[in-house]
Amino acid sequence: MCGIIGYIGPRKASPIIVEGLKRLEYRGYDSAGIATSHEGRILIKKGAGKIDELAKRLNFTDLPGNIGIGHTRWATHGIPNDTNAHPHTDCTGKIVVVHNGIIENFQELKEELLRQGHVFRSDTDTEVIAHLIEENLRITGNFEDAFRLSLLRLRGSFALVVMFADDPERLYIARKDSPLIIGIGNGEMFIASDIPAFLPYTRKAVFLDDGEYGVVSRNGFTVKDIITGKEKRKKVYEIQWTLEMAEKGGYDHFMLKEIFEQPRAVKDAIYGNLEEVPKIAGLLSKYDRIIITGMGTSYHAALVGKYLIQRFGKIPVLVEEASELRYEYEDILDNKTLLIAITQSGETADTVAAMKLAKSKGSKVIGIVNVVGSLATRIADATLYTHAGPEIGVAATKTYTTQLTVLLLLSLELGKMNGVDTTQVENTLPKLPELIDAGLKMNEKIKELAKSLNDRRDFFYIGRGISYPTALEGALKIKEIAYVHAEGLSAGELKHGPLALIEEGVPVIGVAPSGKTFEKMLSNIEEAKARGGFIITVGDDLRLHQVSNVFIRLPKVPEEVSPITYIVPLQLLAYHLAVLKGHNPDRPRNLAKSVTVE
């Protein structure tokens, strides 16, 4: 949530800042702004609205200077308007700040600074930081000391970049519970809240850890501990993503591109984990209790993981949303428990907090993560990467199917350790890309289906057993990007209440692969049809055709594989509904790609 970009080097900063902000739009924002330092002055342009409109109206790229910072704001303190947009300055206009996160003690600090004569222009918590640095600079006369002393006063979460008019060769950065990355170029440096912002210029990155600050010049950087002030050595990561991966490549939207990238992404997830999965499966087999956690789509992947690990690994599994786990499982986590944490970004605030809690209680923590070097990978005892590549669309697609693929690989390895016959499922793995492609070939049919459903106000997705999470995920996609009410339900729950909502013409989407719950699922679908539901089914058994208004037939696969292949038509349905309604599926309202605040 929110985006930060900073640049220092030989080039004009403002075009690079604007380009970086555009690459961070998927994080969600309501206003944007940039600042540069030039000839001893801080120059700022900012406002509420979208970057393209602001850049044109305010001529962002006209700002001179070879050092600059930019920000896309998601409002937390203060309404979205021009004044509350970042960057923010102190009283002198010579200190400028951009900040992601929430300063919890900002009101207390603001009152103190007001008593000292500081004048505030905005309602934001961020502006407090600029004035606090101004006050400490007046006392110390040293830029770095003033910066660090100010950081010590802040409570809450922050990723921030500070620029001084009187110190035009350095940017000052800090992180606590919000991501911040240094991009290392050739005689130039970049700061960003996510990798795509500087991907056109460098693939070398350093990830700040919580409680660290840094001083960045065009030729290097130092990173220190906020509390002790001691310098820390940092690992430089080589990012494997290419610039082309983070561009639309001829598709109308990133989401559609990412849906169609799933055959490649799943293949990469399989072959990228051949060595690591056996090691981590061996670790899992030593534990009597496993908890899987995540948020949003990653939580739905966790639910599938529960079915897979229990079925093949014969180990009891609990699944909990990370936002709940960290408050309700404090007395359950111990050194006999293993936690699997699933997070695409590796920076999801609630998931990271749950991982930290588990570690503090002596639990082993395994991460299933997409972004190399992210905070979750540095907290976890071991990490399985999903190898999905950059996912720009806010609604998760390829990162979901690759999470499921990793969980399937892990479960199969556990099954082999337990003497379970995994042959049928293992034989399906090399065919997964073409099986996913079969769903993608339904694109035109699903587009026509979406047209017929465009006026419907309620959708009900039903599934049983391992297909229940697929129903949840299908419903989430509709809600996220088409802004239509949708519920994902366990089909067995229909007659316990939800059936009262089924009436003539209400779409009911049944996720019904062949397997041990199919007969029951068929009965549940017939119940919904008898109440007038418009029945759409996804499955392989031709009996579904007889009870369906629309039957989306997919190749028959082992039930354990079906969550990977059956979600594809549901992703396409959500996408086409969103486009038909005139919504941008890449940037749904009120949502952000990475939820980095609690």
UniProtKB/Swiss-Prot annotation:
The active site is at 2 (nucleophile), 593 (for fru-6p isomerization activity). Keywords: Aminotransferase, Cytoplasm, Glutamine amidotransferase, Repeat, Transferase. It is found in: Cytoplasm. InterPro entries: GATase_2_dom, GFAT, GFAT_N, GlmS/AgaS_SIS, GlmS/FrlB_SIS, Ntn_hydrolases_N, SIS_dom, SIS_dom_sf. Transmembrane segments: none annotated. Residues 2-219 form the Glutamine amidotransferase type-2 domain. The keyword Cytoplasm applies. This is Glutamine--fructose-6-phosphate aminotransferase [isomerizing].
